[in-house]
Amino acid sequence: MVGAFSHLDTAAGQSLAGEGISRLEQARSLPYRDLMAKAEKSTKASKPSTKGKKQSKAAGKSKARAKLSPRRLLRRWLGRATLGFLVVTLLPILLFSVINPPTTHTIWSEYRRLGDVDREWVPIEHIAPALGRSVVAAEDARFCQHWGLDAQAIRAAIADGGQRGGSTISQQVVKNVFLWQGRSWFRKALETLMTPMVEAVWTKRRILEVYLNVAEMGEGVFGAEAAARHYFGVGPDELSRRQAALLATVLPNPKERSAAKPTAFMRKRAAQIMDGAATIRADGRAACFED
């Protein structure tokens, strides 16, 4: 009997002890879980969401824009517009400094009007030096002395009431290659802005080479190669001084004048051009485009 009671006491003691340990562990574990849960909540609360960050950045930018004065906004947009203009204009200028222009606005317009044009590109080495000197003497005697815009020629044109042009060969190249024909202040402004850029990138020899290949020298006749064969039946490297001077007289009015059938005025003008070509060769004003 005593043994049985002692056995029961032992079992009851073990049960109570186990229950006590279990309660103790539960009591210990509950605060730990609560602590961990609170820690996780605080961590989540301390970390702002990506969406929140983006919204705060956007709000900051909008506030910064709002703080900008109209003058600053205008400066910013003008700066961007200027940068865009420089990129758009410099790329073709750089490209055509090494690649020959495939066509021009005038050539394309005449091709559409006439159905065909006479034109073949030739390097300046295959063009008689007399033609280069004649064209410079006739169109822009100070070609080697200015940076694209000739102030003296502009003043002379204004004094003459606009009866004669003040455009340099460089300006004519810009107009022919990059712009369009016709008179407008907008085109003239673009031409004035782009000409110094061409002068800064191209050599004078390259400018003259392009001019001699794209200039209109007769109805549907463009460039030295086509003009030499059309009027005289010779190659551009075989032109005489007189033939070169006659071609130069055609340039101001290529649709009305013919180098093969010169008028009295054209013959007189050709003689003046021959003298001018000899002068710029002697005084060094042809040095920038001749070897």
What are these regions (language model features)?
Residues M1, H7-D9, L24, F85, ...:
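Residue-level detector of alpha-helical transmembrane segments in integral membrane proteins
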